[in-house]
């Protein structure tokens, strides 16, 4: 609407910030925005997820996605040595949405990841991988042991491991340890993560 210079209707709006997901600005409000707003910052869903995780982990606050727009916008601005007020509003969020956002945030920060390795199909291999991961302080969340990846079952078994890490550096350390042990690890991309939008 600001670009067009008049109130315009979008064909669709797709965002997790549902409280501000409007296709058309208000007729009465729009002239005030034209006259008084200096700039508009566009925030994508992945930035809102990071802002949500920051608020939960660092401030122990739950703020709905639309209420986090101001926090996410701060990362686009030079706020050093300035007094800034970021208004946080709303707690309209159900537990399932909250859980999903936290999970996606952990994935974006490399705090949760899945790696696939091929193992010889013989006793002790799973224990060997588990011991290596424990040594690297990788916390196993989930294991998927697939013996049907190959026609020759004795040749290889696929093991998919979902792990908790401290961040990107730790994740890379775990992957390097698996590589060093001769496992040719492959990172598995999570389907449906917000970063794919």
Q: Model-found features: residue ranges?
A:
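Active-site-adjacent helical/loop segments in soluble small-molecule enzymes
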Residues: 26-82
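A conserved regulatory-domain signal marking ACT and ACT-like small-molecule sensing domains
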Residues: 95-197
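A short, charged, Gly/Pro-tolerant segment at domain boundaries
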Residues: 68-69, 87-92, 193-196
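Short low-complexity, flexible loop/linker segments enriched in glycine and/or proline
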Residues: 4, 57-58, 156-159
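Glycine- and other small-residue-rich loops at beta-strand/loop junctions that grip anionic moieties
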Residues: 18, 22, 40-41, 60-63, ...
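Residues at the C-termini of beta-strands that transition into short coil/loop
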Residues: 44, 88, 189
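Glycine-rich phosphate/pyrophosphate-binding loop at beta-loop-alpha junctions
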Residues: 1-35, 75-120, 130
């Amino acid at each position: 609407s600001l670009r067009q210079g008049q109130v315009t209707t979008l064909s669709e709006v797709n965002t997790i910030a549902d409280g501000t997901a409007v296709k058309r600005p208000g007729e009465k409000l729009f002239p005030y925005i034209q006259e008084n707003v200096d700039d508009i910052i566009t925030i994508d869903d992945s930035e809102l997820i990071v802002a949500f995780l920051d608020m939960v982990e660092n401030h122990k606050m739950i703020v709905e996605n639309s209420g986090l727009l101001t926090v996410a916008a701060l990362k686009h601005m030079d706020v050093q040595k300035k007094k800034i007020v970021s208004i946080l509003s709303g707690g309209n969020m159900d537990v399932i949405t909250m859980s999903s956002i936290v999970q996606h945030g952990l994935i974006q920060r490399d705090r949760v990841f899945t790696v696939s390795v091929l193992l010889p199909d013989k006793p002790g291999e799973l224990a060997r991988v588990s011991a290596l991961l424990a040594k690297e302080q990788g916390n196993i969340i989930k294991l998927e042991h697939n013996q049907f990846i190959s026609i020759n079952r004795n040749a290889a078994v696929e093991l998919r491991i979902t792990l908790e890490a401290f961040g990107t550096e730790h994740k890379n350390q775990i992957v390097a340890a698996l590589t060093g042990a001769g496992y040719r690890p492959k990172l598995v991309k999570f389907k449906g993560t917000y970063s794919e939008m």
